[in-house]
């Protein structure tokens, strides 16, 4: 792989049918670990970033380990995924990309459907948070609505 940015930019960014098939597929591959996690899901038109940051700060001050998933990023993709204010490293992203890449290809072959960039980075973030045993995951809604992959 050339670099993280090129890999992320290779993902499908168009519209898909509104369903959660991709997320369910990947969560099943990982034994539905998401069912064991505590989520705070931030949605709405304005203020998601501020609200996410405030809640994260409160929980960290109380001694909790907090995973935070936001979008968009300003400079690097790493900004979207953090634990207790520390962004995921390039090495950690590459390790997860290498692990997930065969599953992405398997999904595309079997389901005859692309995985979107936002689905992929959400899956990557959830696995990262799970493996790092966070107490809470704060997720900013992506597109919003019933079929949002967050």
Language-model features: locations:
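A conserved segment at the C-terminal end of the G1
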Residues: 38-42, 50-67
